[in-house]
Amino acid sequence: MVNDSCFLSGLVKVKTKFNNHDQTSWRPKSVYHYIQWKNSSPDFLVDISGFVDVKLKAIRAYKSQFFDSNNNEPETLISKKNFLNDVINRSADLGRLIGVDNAEGFTTNRVIGINYLNDIK
């Protein structure tokens, strides 16, 4: 649905309005999907080794969404006690695939190009 929407948004004959004003057609150059919990094969990995602490701090900013032994809300994937450990372990496992400490995986429907073979880890 996201890829179709991005394609359609670039068609001149598709007319849309926002706040009663016509929108100009525009299409993003690329669409990348972050791999969350599905065991998907990434199309590429990004080294996040220097940013894991920042990522965890950002996640913890939403602490009401996560495990709280005093909470009576229904359990979700992110409210499980081991959620943060899962995040750390997943990034470490993906990092292992490219020889770094931590990585995040992404998928895309397009072919990715690089300038130099040496840029590939």
Question: Model-derived features: where do they sit?
Answer:
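Metal-dependent de-N-acetylase/amidase catalytic core
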Residues: M1-K121
